[in-house]
Swiss-Prot record:
Gene source species: Thiobacillus denitrificans (strain ATCC 25259 / T1)
GO cellular component terms attached to this protein's record: cytoplasm
Record's function text: Transfers and isomerizes the ribose moiety from AdoMet to the 7-aminomethyl group of 7-deazaguanine (preQ1-tRNA) to give epoxyqueuosine (oQ-tRNA).
Subunit structure: Monomer.
Top-tier EC class: transferase
Gene: queA
Alphabetically ordered keywords of this record: Cytoplasm, Queuosine biosynthesis, S-adenosyl-L-methionine, Transferase
Annotated EC: 2.4.99.17
Lineage: Bacteria, Pseudomonadati, Pseudomonadota, Betaproteobacteria, Nitrosomonadales
Protein name: S-adenosylmethionine:tRNA ribosyltransferase-isomerase
Pfam short name (any one): Queuosine_synth
InterPro entries assigned: QueA, QueA_dom1, QueA_dom2, QueA_sf
Pathway in which this enzyme or protein is active: tRNA modification; tRNA-queuosine biosynthesis
Subcellular compartments: Cytoplasm
Amino acid sequence: MRVADFDFELPPDLIAQFPPDVRGASRLLHVTAAGALHDRMFRELPTLLGADDLLVMNDTRVIKARLFGEKDSGGRVELLVERVTGEFEALAFIRASHAPKPGARIRLADDVALDVLDKQHDLTRLHFPAPVLDVLDRCGRLPLPPYIEHAPTEEDEARYQTVYANEPGAVAAPTAGLHFDAAMLGTLQTQGVRTARVTLHVGAGTFQPVRVAEVADHVMHSERYTVPAATVAAIAETRARGGRVVAVGTTSLRALEAASASGSVEAGVGETAIFITPGYRFRTVDALVTNFHLPRSTLLMLVSAFSGIETIRRAYAHAIAERYRFFSYGDAMFLEKASLETPA
């Protein structure tokens, strides 16, 4: 397969720059297992779920990972913390006219100074003078995606975060979860739909373009995930009842499928660079709540694996014609796993 097979033209004005006025006031494109398309509103999601179904949500919390500082020479430095590796250490991407070398210092606001320890491939290991998360809360900015063109605001700090975010560590939001508010979660609970949690700390690699021509040549970035024992038990109970496992977002799906490498989902903590493309056989997830993804992206390949390439092409063409809003602050899809998972 060629990466060009996953390209499409998107009018720039369909890229959502701001969230809807009310969380959850989004549209929902329902794609059935047979490939039928239905235009709905996100508030209708409970009508698509049964009492025996299980929603699995990613409870990662976005950190203020973007930092601005100066080198001792006075040169400006922009940092994006990719991963917190210890209480006082982190790995970061650094943008500067001349990259600071090991032993150099980067000065942030309020006389906070970071020590450059060493390089690890494209990342730089940094030592912080105080706990990393404290420094980020004090000096950092929310790392909005590159296609959102405004500087982060207080509204973004609230809305670019799920209402159930709990585990700090992501540099991008698990955006399918942004549609859920407390009222929706209450409705689902009343209906008997259960929820469970996984954690996958979304890395900056989620925004990196695929730079190769052939899909098979792409190398995925690695991300940390946790699947609790309680979630594994909930999945087993759901299977016993005949219900569906519904992943909220591609990050939840990737965590569950990574933890299912043996054939069934297992509890644990790990790293995954799972790359899901058409032809992949899904082991755990039966349905998926997701946003609309970027052209030529690995996430578009993932949903094409889930629903079929031609079905996703039709769905995206329909969404563009009907002026759905795209990407992080955009509208959602509810995908039922294709009856036959084939490359077509």
